[in-house]
Design a protein with these regions (language model features):
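Charged, amphipathic alpha-helical regulatory modules used
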Residues: 1-110
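Conserved catalytic cores of very large enzyme subunits
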Residues: 89, 96-502
Length: 502
């Protein structure tokens, strides 16, 4: 017996192909629901016993499906049918002359034209379409997109996308199964350290290290998904770095003054350092060290100057850390060197002196701009506004809110998130910054939790990709404008088509 393939070629019947196809479908179901070897052999025997010299490959597949259905192997049948459909779509994708021509023209444009000449190279504003890695990424994206349409979705969805009725965002990442945007919980990463896959990073102990690791966390996460990376409470997460830096500066400054005044024989430096280790805020006064100076005016002045200088040094170092953070996120590469990380940060509600110092210096660094004064594209910054925190003149962070207005007037960022709005306020719990709504790079917010209402928080949350519907197209089609305009809008037809697309 010979088998007629879809292209008309004749090949000898090969029973192993039936066996392999059914066994592939078997692998996807539980063992007790799989077609047995005897059942597979019966199908093979049935085909071989047919009194035919030639048989179409589609007829063999129909026989397999009918037998699986008759013997109640429903899950195996579903897997086999899906495999058959995917193979059919793949053949159509790569044998359809019109589609193949369009695909090859796209690749031709990527290879032979500049971004100024080719729209495909400008599809993503965060990718330099003229760079080697940018072009390589777009080659891969186009191939992956065609693979997704051929193997991972029904033909009607792929056709609707190609015809412009819908737009399936990030289709080139469909095959990878990655998430879109994510709110990174830096607290977990900082406390235990983390690995980027090429080595483990220890817990940071200075505001410079905190800002560097925050940028690295964003860059690393960018390589694990296709969307944007966001930090939901930047000020809260980096505040401990300010305190650690202050304590380090205070130890060094006091020791330097003691050396300068030649007081090492009269002062127990180790005891002073133990007291500094207990400090839990940068808001300390000279009274904290009273037991060390007692009646010595010289020692009292020494501690006063040390506290003042340490605060100044910490503030300056925090500014430098924020400046480095902004520059890093606008220069460090991710995704094979084709993009800078698409990043967002939320801040503005930490009223501690450490958190306020982070917020203030980040906005000042953003206001200063990049090397030649350019407006930083990233990170997208969102200032969280809350009555009792920063909205009214009597609120502790009101000065930072005013600074955000000044910076945004010059740099377009920060934007503002109003925590007292009707769709944000129900989630807010005083004293728990995790319940403050934060926004991601794609401008979305995720905080509600229908599975566990006790975990309605922002850190660690994210989303999947989106599909847009071309409302103007169906509006024009059923409306009173355009070359096929109706005398009266067909609202019923509009909603019927909208329902179908949804």
């Amino acid at each position: 017996m010979q088998v007629v393939k879809r292209d008309g070629k004749l090949v000898d019947f090969d029973q192993s192909k039936i066996r392999v196809a059914i066994e592939k479908a078997n692998r996807e179901v539980r063992p007790r629901e799989r077609a047995t070897k005897d059942e597979i052999n019966q199908i093979i025997d049935y085909v071989e016993d047919l009194d035919k010299k030639r048989i179409l490959v589609e007829d063999i597949q129909d026989i397999i499906e009918e037998t699986l259905k008759k013997d109640k192997y429903d899950d195996v049948l579903e897997n086999f049918a899906n495999y058959r459909e995917n193979r059919s779509k793949a053949r159509e994708t790569f044998t359809d002359d019109k589609r193949s021509h369009k695909f090859l023209k796209t690749l031709e444009g990527l290879a032979l034209k500049s971004a100024a000449e080719d729209d495909a190279k400008r599809e993503n504003g965060n990718i330099d379409g003229n760079s080697a890695m940018g072009t390589m990424l777009q080659f891969g994206s186009n191939v992956s997109r065609e693979f997704s349409k051929a193997y991972l979705m029904k033909k009607k969805f792929a056709d609707a996308h190609d015809e412009g009725y819908i737009h399936i965002h990030d289709m080139d990442f469909e095959a990878m199964g990655t998430t879109t945007c994510m709110q990174i919980d830096l607290d977990k990463l900082f406390k235990n350290g983390f690995s980027t896959g090429h080595g483990h990073l220890r817990e940071p102990n200075d505001i410079m290290s905190y800002s560097a690791l925050a940028a690295i966390a964003i860059q690393s996460n960018q390589n694990d998904q296709h969307g944007g990376q966001s930090i939901p409470a930047f000020d809260y997460y980096l505040a401990p770095g300010v305190l650690k830096t202050f304590k380090k500066m205070l130890k060094t400054t006091i020791k330097d003054y003691i050396d300068l005044e030649d007081l090492n024989d009269f002062v127990n430096v180790a005891s002073i350092e133990k007291e500094i280790a207990k400090i839990n805020t940068i808001d300390i006064t000279v009274d904290y060290f009273e037991k060390f100076y007692k009646t010595s005016d010289l020692m009292k002045r020494l501690f006063e100057m040390s506290i003042k200088k340490s605060l100044e040094k910490t503030d300056k170092r925090t500014y430098q850390a924020m400046e480095a953070f902004v520059h890093n996120l606008n220069t460090m590469h991710s995704r094979a060197g084709a993009q800078v990380p698409f990043s967002s940060i939320n801040f503005g509600t930490d009223t501690s002196s450490e958190g306020r110092m982070v917020t203030k210096n980040y906005m000042l660094a953003s206001e200063a701009g990049l090397g030649h004064g350019e407006t930083p594209i990233f990170p997208i910054s969102i200032f969280k506004v809350k009555e009792g925190v920063n909205y009214n003149p009597e609120d502790p962070n009101y000065d930072l809110f005013k600074l955000s207005l000044r910076v945004s007037a010059k740099r377009l960022f920060p934007n503002w998130s109003f925590l007292d709005s009707s769709f944000n306020k129900p989630y807010y719990k005083a004293g728990d910054f995790r319940t403050e709504v934060g926004y991601m790079g794609c401008r979305t917010r995720v905080i509600g939790n229908v599975v566990d209402p006790d975990k309605q928080i922002t850190p660690g949350r994210g989303n999947l990709s989106f599909t847009s519907i071309n409302l103007p197209r169906i509006g024009i089609k059923h409306g009173i404008v355009g070359k096929n305009a109706l005398d009266k809008a067909d609202m019923k037809g509009f909603y019927e088509e909208l329902d179908e697309l949804m």
